[in-house]
Amino acid sequence: MTPAEFQALTGATSQQITDLETFIERLAEANAVMNLIGPDTLPDVWNRHIWDSTQLLALAPDARTWADLGAGAGFPGVVLAILLKGVPDAHVWLIDSLGKRCRFLQAVVDELGLPATVVNGRAEEQMIRVDVVTARAVAAMDKLLGYAQPYLQRGAQGLFLKGEKVEAELIEARNVWQFDSDLSVSRSDPRGRIVSVRSLRRVHSR
């Protein structure tokens, strides 16, 4: 996928494309000195990472506030912040426990003037009320729901980008958690799935 193809697919503005291109440049620079994404995925960054992140917006079109847990390389959180820039009351919290990743994220947020706050800390310890909590490539569903619990119990919808083994992960997670969920096929990779979660509560402790 090229920037022009992404723009035709999504209706992104020229400024949004410019911001996304700047983000990709900064990501490539940072990736040379720290492991943010697999270097072999950079040539397909527009489909593999940008479009993969963007598709979440269609699943929560009215959402204005998002929390990205384990924000790492900025997927999906930075992409969402770029696309939501200028939308009234929009804000994205980028939460990561590793300081060097947070410094990278903060530099991008500052350069692009994004409606985002970088939080260096553990996801499950933050008391933030948002419309949607999301994560990508962070943990299996049983652990991920533990990280997301404070947000889900404050009314957030969970939208989690997962791989083709997610159904087995959901079976395992139901040994620990009770929740309502729906699966959508990823629009960037038919093997991927997006898990929508609501109404989480723990059924017993491990």
Functional labels for PLM-detected ranges:
Residues L27, K162, V197:
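Residue-level signal for inorganic ion chemistry
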Residues M1-A67, G99-L114:
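Class I SAM-dependent transferase core
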Residues K165-R206:
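Active-site capping/gating segments
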Residues T54-A135, L145:
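Conserved SAM/SAH cofactor-binding pocket of Class I
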Residues S97, V138, L161-K165:
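Short strand-turn motif at the edge of the Rossmann-like AdoMet-binding core
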Residues N31, L84, V109, R174-W177:
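Conserved hydrophobic residues forming the short capping helix/wall of the S-adenosyl-L-methionine
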Residues H91, P115-T117, Q157, Q178-D182:
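Conserved beta-strand segments of alpha/beta enzyme cores
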Residues L145-G158:
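A short glycine-rich, Lys/Arg-flanked "PGG" loop and its adjoining helix->strand segment in the class I
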